[in-house]
Amino acid sequence: VFRRQRQMCIRDRNHLEKTDIKDKKVGLRVDLNVPIENGEILSHERLSAALPTILHILKQTDKLCVITHLGRPREGEFDINQSVLPIKKWFEKRLNMNIELLNNFENIPDNICFMENIRFFKGEKDNDKNLSQQIANVFDVYVMDAFATAHRTAASTFGAIELSKNACAGLLFSDEIKNLESALEENKQILSVVGGSKVSTKLEVIKNLITKSSSVVVGGGIANTFLKAAGKPIGNSLVEDNMLDT
């Protein structure tokens, strides 16, 4: 998945800065998956990182719909605790404008809006073609800026890109690719650090990094699975038992 998106965004030079979005309806897939407790956002780093792309788009069009996931809700069910409402409110304050919160792709307004948690939508996780087509059809330009979830074959991070009339990489995504290309240049000693909770979603990335890195360090929940596979005690820590023999 990552290789195909990289080919689309880099080799074909489909960058946001080189894409005509003047007065176009733009869908922006970002990764604003931040910790929220009692409606309060505990970390604003990912929100701040998304601002340059959002501001770049708003300079050329008001027709922007921001799409993100948040947590791991049960697909097809609304969960107020995993609503993007607090995130929308944060951007309203930063941008000093009212932002509408939507729950479907049927009536996208001609002004900035936020789509509700994309993982509430049936078919997102399994890259359902109908959902992918629905997302792709409603926008003139679809911008992928969710680098941290680019490895997922979900409807909003993969299917919609393939089916979009005009898809491109956002500013953050392009910067991450440039940094990776620089890091992976020949004759460099590379230490790769991989975190996260699930080995299953990072396995191919880890395999690729092993061939390109001097050393690979795993942390977070991923490390627990490696430790248990090596026979080390991990107590009640998060682990993927189905990946122990991989």
Range-by-range predicted roles:
Residues 11-246:
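Active-site loop-to-helix "anion-binding N-cap" substructures in soluble metabolic enzymes
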